[in-house]
A protein has these predicted regions:
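Conserved structural scaffold segments of CAZyme catalytic domains across common CAZy folds
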Residues: 1-102, 111
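Single conserved hydrophobic/aromatic residue that forms the stacking wall/gate
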Residues: 168-176
Length: 176
């Protein structure tokens, strides 16, 4: 079960604000921007989905769009689009994980790479540490878009090596 159903059906957005045409990770201050009121991965909606999941026998909930960068993530060929660490101002990662745990639900982490593999690998250790800190037990890694660097393919050797790196990194993070 996932919050993303609202997004793919056009009821809500992955992004927090409509005020940006370009995001600069570690420079864009989301606290100074006006929320668009259609961002799906917010505390209120996620808690509602957690309640639904608990009531209907689900054990986990996937939450896409929780982290900064979604305003210009797709088809821009940006190497540095997400940091996999910084939630939007309306997503309290600790509060939501505690709430989910009280209801017997696990939140599933989402790491959309937008095809920027070097960027994901650059942040992987910290991203998995954040997951461990907050009790996440699983992650869905996304690879929407063309793979960066240019010329690489989703199922070429470059990506096979990346997937192997993912396995080793996640296993090592799980041991900590």
């Amino acid at each position: 079960m996932g919050v993303w159903w609202e997004m793919i059906t056009g009821q809500s957005t992955w992004w927090y604000t409509n005020d940006l045409s370009s995001v600069r990770i570690n420079e864009t201050n989301y606290d100074e921007l006006e929320p668009n009121d259609s961002h799906a991965a917010n505390n209120k909606k996620v808690m509602r989905y957690i309640d639904f999941a608990a009531q209907h026998g689900f054990d986990a909930l996937l939450v896409e769009g929780w982290n900064i960068g979604w305003e210009d993530w797709f088809n821009k060929k940006k190497d540095y689009v997400f940091d996999f660490l910084t939630p939007y101002p309306d997503f309290d990662i600790e509060k939501l994980n505690n709430y989910a745990k009280e209801k017997g639900i696990s939140l599933m982490m989402h790491h959309e790479t937008s095809g920027a593999i070097r960027n994901y690998e650059r942040h992987m250790d910290e991203a998995y540490s954040l997951m461990n800190k907050h009790g996440y037990k699983s992650v869905k890694s996304g690879y929407v878009g063309r793979i960066i660097p240019a010329g690489e393919r989703h199922y070429g050797q470059y990506m096979v090596d990346h997937y192997i790196c993912l396995l080793y990194t996640s296993d090592a993070a799980d041991d900590n």
